[in-house]
Regions:
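Anionic ligand-binding catalytic core segments
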Residues: 1-48, 52-148
Length: 148
């Protein structure tokens, strides 16, 4: 997105770009799901270079596959829990109500279900981490932050 020279500081801006590119409602919903994941999973490295679009040969724009999705909350950092992109003007302490209001303003349907699905995935982090053999030290550290 940086090559387009649009100033994007908020998730609202990201959705404006999606509308300008004529993304489908399904893809805008997927963008919303990714935003919810970033908020709930403490992926605060959610800057604009971590969101991309691809143009298909027929000239239609689509969201790219998700990438650079990592746990990035460091309790020892000055920037602990500060998101790069804001949600309703907030970089931290983003609530479920904020996510629902955002969805309403962006005409995203089934926001409550999306939030619940993502919450379930995040709350089951330990089982996913154990399957891919993440060290127990890191599992405990990440779980502590996710459960705060």
């Amino acid at each position: 997105m940086s090559s387009l020279k649009w100033k994007i500081d908020t998730y609202e801006d990201l959705f404006v770009v999606g509308r300008k590119l004529k993304l489908s409602a399904e893809e805008q919903t997927q963008q919303y799901r990714r935003m919810v994941f970033n908020v709930l999973a403490e992926n605060v490295d959610d800057h604009t270079k971590n969101f991309s679009f691809v143009m298909y040969p027929n000239g239609e724009w689509h969201i790219s596959p998700a990438y650079d999705i990592v746990f990035s909350a460091d309790p020892d950092s000055h920037f602990y829990r500060y998101h790069e992109l804001t949600v309703l003007g907030k970089r931290k302490n983003i609530t479920k109500q904020d996510l629902l209001l955002f969805a309403q303003r962006q005409d995203i349907r089934n926001a409550s279900s999306i939030i619940e699905e993502v919450e379930d995935v995040v709350m089951n982090f330990k089982s996913y981490a154990e399957k891919v053999e993440i060290d127990e030290h890191w599992i405990r550290k990440i779980e502590r932050v996710l459960n705060e």
